[in-house]
A protein has these predicted regions:
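Structured beta-strand/loop patches that form or line metal/cofactor-binding pockets in enzymes
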Residues: 41-69
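Rossmann-like adenosine-cofactor binding region
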Residues: 262-363, 368
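Flexible, glycine/charged-enriched surface loops at secondary-structure junctions
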Residues: 21, 37-44, 117, 154-163, ...
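Adenosine-phosphate binding glycine-rich loop
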Residues: 2-23, 218, 333-445
């Protein structure tokens, strides 16, 4: 395989999907050496088969707003690869959603799910509908209209969606209710469900907790304790909230949180009471992060900016893709950050990743460090299949073990000659090899 040539060919075929091309171009060079050790991969054109989704579903979603006006949005489901298990990946409701973004997410999800060691393929879906500013009734009607089409393409052994940006417990509940009404079946066809109807304990916390568990494993390779470390966190949604919670539990000090309008910096640190306020603000009141300074006036709010120029020890980007550019990465390194663990999907631009790696700081890509969410989704699928509910302690112990296993695989495949652990290479090679071997064993399908 010539990785550069494959990327150029894909650019020509998909010129209007920059996020997808970015994801592929970041992965292929890191697996090129390992791929070329296996001539049978090239014979069966494995890399092109892995890069291009099995199936791309596009559909119209028509719904009625509270004023009686008919609205139309686009719906998507990218079923990328099911070589190691049923398609698995979240649904994103955000105005930025398009085919290129979802193809990048589905591609990344395939590697991430492989890393978990659980039998799950890769997928992603969603819509350019945004729940922000919509009434609860409007969100319900949209979710029902979305499921009216999606239900034909999913199932507990076929494709199991979950939540993502804009799709939380409320939306998953509406989607599941409509699926049940349409099919007359109560199945584990969605994960992230409420506890009373088949959800798993620790699922809301899993991505944030898992990111911090992975971070502590990274720090341990250099005999560094997380206790007392100052942490920059972006985002204020599910991932950011529970990453902050786990940091607090382990003695670290969250200093920032953000949303799409700007970020807050609290020089005193965000303690338990302050985090509870943020959770109430974002999850119940659906407010904006700038309201934090009204409650805690010693904090500062920066409109339209991101938190990466602040001084701290650790950075946890937990908001969205491409949120750290080269200048921001250089500022993080200059200001003494020793570790960056991605809680979001592909939040660091390629030039930012290069700066982190050139500086030899600890850096992990999202497919490794944020795999806790889909890991517990897999555990939710297991509980649904068994008709059992595990305790929070049981699920959390599974999560810790899975994140530790992912870290060990990254170290195995990513340790370089000078001892530096290239987590990007390690995660990509480890995830790729499992999927590649499964695809080879199953023939040209």
């Amino acid at each position: 395989m010539n990785a550069a040539k494959v990327v150029e060919d894909l650019k020509m075929r998909f010129p209007n999907e920059p996020e997808y091309i970015q994801a592929v171009s970041q992965v292929l060079p890191t697996i090129e050496e390992e791929y070329n050790k296996h001539p049978e991969f090239e014979k069966y054109n494995l890399i092109e088969r892995l890069c291009i989704p099995d199936r791309v579903l596009e559909f119209r979603v028509t719904w009625v707003d509270d004023k009686g006006n008919v609205q139309t949005n686009m719906g998507y489901r990218i079923q990328h690869n099911n070589a190691i298990g049923p398609y698995k990946g979240g649904l994103r409701y955000h105005k930025s959603v398009n085919l290129g973004i979802l193809k990048f997410l589905a591609f990344e999800q395939t590697f991430k799910n492989s890393l978990t060691t659980l039998p799950m393929g890769g997928a992603k879906g969603g819509s350019d509908f945004s729940p922000r500013g919509k009434s609860d009734a409007e969100v319900m009607r949209f979710c029902q209209a979305f499921m009216n089409e999606l239900y034909r393409h999913i199932g507990p052994d076929e494709d199991v969606p979950a939540g993502d940006i804009g799709v939380g417990g409320r939306e998953v509940g509406y989607l599941f209710g409509q699926y049940k009404k349409l099919t007359h079946q109560f199945q584990g066809v969605l994960t992230g469900k409420g506890i009373p109807f088949g959800g798993s304990l620790i699922r809301p916390e899993a991505t944030g907790y898992g990111t911090v568990y992975f971070l502590t494993s990274m720090l341990a390779t250099r005999n560094i304790d997380i206790k007392g470390k100052k942490v920059l966190i972006s985002g204020a949604g599910n991932v950011a909230q529970y990453a902050a919670e786990k940091c607090l539990q382990l003695g670290a000090i969250p200093m920032t949180m953000s949303d799409s309008d700007g970020y807050i910096y609290d020089p005193e640190g965000i303690d338990r009471a302050k985090l509870d306020y943020i959770m109430e603000l974002k999850n119940v009141e659906r407010g904006r992060i700038k309201e934090y300074i009204e409650e805690y006036p010693n904090a500062k709010y920066y409109e339209g900016k991101r938190p990466w120029y602040e001084k701290a020890d650790i950075a946890l980007p937990c908001a969205t893709q491409n949120e750290i550019n080269g200048d921001e990465a250089a500022a993080l390194v200059k200001n003494g950050v020793i570790a960056v663990a991605e809680g979001a999907n592909m939040p660091s631009l390629p030039e930012a990743i290069k700066i982190f790696q050139d500086a030899k700081i600890l850096y992990s890509p999202g497919k490794a460090s944020n795999a806790g969410g889909v890991s517990v989704s897999g555990l939710e699928m297991s509980q649904n299949s068994e008709r059992l509910s595990w305790t929070a302690e049981e699920v959390d112990n599974y999560l810790k073990r899975i994140m530790n296993d992912i870290h060990e695989n990254c170290v195995k495949y990513g340790t370089e000659a000078d001892g530096y652990i290239n987590y990007v290479k390690g995660a990509n090679v480890a995830g790729f090899m499992k999927v590649a071997k499964a695809m080879m064993a199953q023939g040209l399908v």
